[in-house]
Amino acid sequence: MGRVTERRKVIRIRDGAVSTRPDTLVAEEPLEIRLNGKPLAITMRTPGDDFALAAGFLVSEGVLGEADELQNIVYCAGATVDGSNTYNVVDVRTAPGVVLPDITLERNVYTTSSCGLCGKASLDAVRTTARWTIDDTPPVRLEPELLASLPDRLRAAQRVFDRTGGLHAAALFTEEGELVDIREDVGRHNAVDKLVGRALQSGSLPLSRTVLLVSGRASFELAQKAVMAGIPVLAAVSAPSSLAVDLAAESGLTLVGFLRGASMNVYAGEHRIALRAAAAQG
């Protein structure tokens, strides 16, 4: 299996002085995901948790939703010039009797951090393929101070980022702010898929009383993945896209952006944020 990091020579220029030294870089390799032997998608990812990534991707596509729908996931043969396995192709086998959505069977996709359809078609696709509505009855209720503390907890748990400075992260927290799981990857979407895939494998879906925190911005794709996993709250340290806000509003997802220090913007689902308490303190 590929390594999470690799070493490369770098020429460093600092205060006019030039030096050569080895540097630790985050690894990036393609992963082909097959469904019952048929090619489905290719994503650029950081090696590691590949089976969880594939499972989470299929949850996001509306293909899987229950642990018993998954028979197994295996690496396929894919040799390098020296004959060793590249571990860059995985095949997801569904359990006998599982009926697959027709739209996924012959679809070949190259996924990136900004993949997805456009506008209303994207919103409709999520609505028609989602396994669950977001149902956190009684609603998750979060104090702004708790939300504000999460980015520091995320950063403290980023082990590979400390060595490379080049990874995104996604983390699941309980409504009390306890860290449930964290994954790192060169792509935020992959990090989320790894979280969701592990939840599928452990039979924990839907994630109805959790908070998903992502480094960087909140794209439509990340909002889609949250909705498809039944996550009620998505928070990001940077801005959301307009389509992410539209999806959140339509799906009942709480969407928080610019979560930095003691400030944040709430774009949708404000009923889960204790706004009155925050106003009283201000």
UniProtKB/Swiss-Prot annotation:
One of its GO terms (cellular component) is cytoplasm. The active site is at C115. Its main location: cytoplasm. One of its GO terms (biological process) is Mo-molybdopterin cofactor biosynthetic process. Transmembrane segments: none annotated. Belongs to the FdhD family. Required for formate dehydrogenase (FDH) activity. Acts as a sulfur carrier protein that transfers sulfur from IscS to the molybdenum cofactor prior to its insertion into FDH. NCBIfam families: fdhD_narQ (TIGR00129), PRK00724.1-2 (NF001943). This is Sulfur carrier protein FdhD. It comes from Streptomyces avermitilis (strain ATCC 31267 / DSM 46492 / JCM 5070 / NBRC 14893 / NCIMB 12804 / NRRL 8165 / MA-4680). The lineage of its organism: Bacteria, Bacillati, Actinomycetota, Actinomycetes, Kitasatosporales. The gene is fdhD.
